[in-house]
Amino acid sequence: MSLKDRFDRFIDYFTEDEDSSLPYEKRDEPVFTSVNSSQEPALPMNQPSQSAGAKENNITRLHARQQELANQSQRATDKVIIDVRYPRKYEDATEIVDLLAGNESILIDFQYMTEVQARRCLDYLDGACHVLAGNLKKVASTMYLLTPVNVIVNVEDIRLPDEDQQGEFGFDMKRNRVR
């Protein structure tokens, strides 16, 4: 069977005849098929709609997982453990996000990072917090509390007298200056 015949049959398979009254020509040529276990199955033509459905399914599964974790921790009467992390470089943020995905609370102290690295790390953690429906609260000048969806954090706004006199950055793009 020639390549042209294969191509024509492939085209004929996907074309629709608008006039069905025309007689169909039947060829009496033998059909050769080869069976190879290494051939890949044909991909469906409506792949973009399936990928949109898959994304929607992933979001639904993520939301269901978050609700499941929230229900599990509400039922648990065990003590709550808060991990304290001192990231020293931006790459440490992925470990912190993994802890959040595991439904753990994390207290993050950025005192060992430069201001630029801390802002970048905080932006990454904030994005992950929104994706995982967590909470990110500033509890001190260089400390943030990252909690899963089922933990509620109430932080009072307490201004210590020495805090305004320090010239440190609060990582919220504003500099605390003495005036």
Swiss-Prot record:
Please cite one Gene Ontology biological process associated with this protein: division septum assembly
Protein location: Cytoplasm
Question: Which InterPro entries does this one have?
Answer: Cell_div_SepF (IPR023052), Cell_div_SepF/SepF-rel (IPR007561), SepF-like_sf (IPR038594)
Signal peptide feature range? none
Highest taxon in the source lineage: Bacteria
In this chain, the stretch annotated as Disordered covers 19-55
Q: Where is the composition biased (Polar residues)?
A: 33-55
Keyword Cell division in the entry? The reply is yes
Q: Member of which family?
A: Belongs to the SepF family.
How does this chain assemble? Homodimer. Interacts with FtsZ.
Summarize the protein's role.
Cell division protein that is part of the divisome complex and is recruited early to the Z-ring. Probably stimulates Z-ring formation, perhaps through the cross-linking of FtsZ protofilaments. Its function overlaps with FtsA.
Protein name per the record: Cell division protein SepF
UniProt organism field? Streptococcus pneumoniae (strain JJA)
